[in-house]
Amino acid sequence: MSQTLQALADGLPVDAFAVLGPHPLADGRRQVRVLAPGAEAMGLIDSRGKLLARMQASAIDGVFEGILSIEGPYRLRIVWPDMVQEIEDPYAFAVTLDESLLLQIAAGDGQALRRALGAQHVQCGEVPGVRFAVWAPHAQRVAVVGDFNGWDVRRHPMRQRIGGFWELFLPRVEAGPRYKYAVTAADGRVLLKADPVARQTELPPATASVVPGTDTFAWTDAAWMAKRDPSAVPAPLSIYEVHAASWRRDGHNQPLDWPTLAEQLIPYVQQLRFTHIELLPITEHPFGGSWGYQPLGLYAPTARHGSPDGFAQFVDACHRAGIGVILDWVSAHFPDDAHGLAQFDGAALYEHADPREGMHRDWNTLIYNYGRPEVTAYLLGSALEWIDHYHLDGLRVDAVASMLYRDYGRAEGEWVPNAHGGRENLEAVAFLRQLNREIAAHFPGVLTIAEESTAWPGVTAAISDGGLGFTHKWNMGWMHDTLSYMQRDPAERAHHHSQLTFGLVYAFDERFVLPISHDEVVHGTGGLLGQMPGDDWRRFANLRAYLALMWAHPGDKLLFMGAEFGQWADWNHDQSLDWHLLEGARHRGVQLLVGDLNATLRRTPALYRGTHRAKGFDWSVADDARNSVLAFIRHDPDGGGVPLLAVSNLTAQPLHDYGVGVPRAGAWREILNTDSAHYGGSNLGNSGRLATEPMGMHGHAQRLRLTLPPLATIYLQAEK
């Protein structure tokens, strides 16, 4: 026994529960052992503080022993050099984790993992405290260390459970202390690791986990949650993409906290009539320069903006204001920081051991092992946690293409084929289907949006039909083609007209979102306005025309912050947007236009009810490359509302008496013109109202004769 006690006191792998705590003696009494390095004296007391037995310091430093003659619970009175502590003995408690939960996690159950792992407030009998639980199957020993035990790796070794799980209940621990796990690897190294399932963390660059508060937040968004019905008539979807740390900053160039963001961002989004905010990843991440796309704390909102409850208050306020919240969520890879998931228990655990499978060369990050059920449970649990605990309305899953292909970013010989010899990552496909299946089953109406840049078939098709089951997919092809077109001098555009029209060949193959995202305004490209050709007048005109064309085009909308008022420069994640630009009338004009585009989208069923259905779209002019003119009809395929005609003239010359075929006779009204003086244009247009002529054109029985302002998009709508 002395050797075992010495090993225990030295922090070596020992079954602590076999040695510490109460153990029956042959005469009916109990022997109690406690490990408390640094303590000066110790006694056993009852619940009222009455001394039951004095503990004797053994010959092994830090180990105290005593004999308890009575039955029932006891507490410890520990005399430290600077205080006296009275607390229950952690090693007097039975297991607190149901084995069935651990078996469910081992089978890939994310809901079970949410309930079991991390720092969970529980009550053992009458005693409140925190149960710490972690998965580390290759470890010889795991201890929890933190502010509550002086970060002494010897003090609180955990109990090993089936499947490589470890748990320990620490009585009377409350919210707020920092903690980590001290993981002893098979080779004897002791690794200090943050909790993979921590619900709260300390502010980077510090890396400890934090015991969270109890779940007492009082939500007030019941009305919003009740209307989240997947069977309802399609609604407008217009997303404002936001990097919370740089949308606006305080006077010291620090990120705003959640209450201040709610106070400033929500009214702004309401003013511009966006339906949703999409946040770049706020899962805790060590490196701010990753924009959140290299996270390690998949269950915790970053501490950069305050507490988890602060984030809940932000979402609640968005919902009360009628704004949905989507989170960019990263399940493709993770960084190799020493405190994180990499080699978590001394061996490849969350990642593949073979770097041909386990490392992203492009990003120098590690790839999750989707073939391991506990890993997929970890990822599924994270997704469900954000949707359930924080009432999120959607997840935009990052870098899906990198998940789907084993040879993504790799040369020949640098990747491992699947079981059938192919390049598809079959385990990742199964995981993505399971992710979408569970979200749809548990949280119907929640969006799942794939950032998928290849032609993988059926990203938004039903799983039963062989698809991946996402509700939406980013249309990267449309974005690349149309931006490339708009960046050309108008005199050259006639030779590249197909870049505008090709997207309509496949526009209804998936449920697409048209993304003008953060990726388009970094790495020296300049802001969206800065990418437009010509002098300042032409740049603004091009931008306005492009945005209106985008809002009329089939597909839901996403616009990154700053584009809505014409930021010139690259986005800089370390500083605020250039809000001073709104002192200029043309920048205010772009902002007014975006608000009007969203208002038009919201009140025009023709623009959103058929946005994913070919029956909601008809060409009028697709082939006028010489004049760089595009014209099409949008209408509600179910017969509601009235049709809308969108016409873009993307040359610098006005066109007069330009004939466009339309499907309905009578009066048509110009409802939006990006060349309006209201938006900073030259104010050339169609005087509000026009009548059709009974002359067939472009496959329609009627035509309109239009004035097309230069570098402009106009909308006309048939009068009822």
Curated annotation (Swiss-Prot):
One of its GO terms (cellular component) is cytosol. The active site is at residues 398, 451. InterPro entries: A-amylase/branching_C, Branching_enzy, GlgB, GlgB_N, GlgB_N_E_set_prok, Glyco_hydro_13_cat_dom, Glyco_hydro_13_N, Glyco_hydro_b. It is an enzyme of class 2 (transferase). It holds the Pfam family Alpha-amylase_C. Its EC number is 2.4.1.18. Pathway: Glycan biosynthesis; glycogen biosynthesis. Keywords: Carbohydrate metabolism, Glycogen biosynthesis, Glycogen metabolism, Glycosyltransferase, Transferase. It catalyses: Transfers a segment of a (1->4)-alpha-D-glucan chain to a primary hydroxy group in a similar glucan chain. One of its GO terms (biological process) is glycogen biosynthetic process. The keyword Protein biosynthesis does not apply. One of its GO terms (molecular function) is hydrolase activity, hydrolyzing O-glycosyl compounds. Catalyzes the formation of the alpha-1,6-glucosidic linkages in glycogen by scission of a 1,4-alpha-linked oligosaccharide from growing alpha-1,4-glucan chains and the subsequent attachment of the oligosaccharide to the alpha-1,6 position. Monomer. Belongs to the glycosyl hydrolase 13 family. GlgB subfamily. This is 1,4-alpha-glucan branching enzyme GlgB 2. It comes from Xanthomonas oryzae pv. oryzae (strain KACC10331 / KXO85).
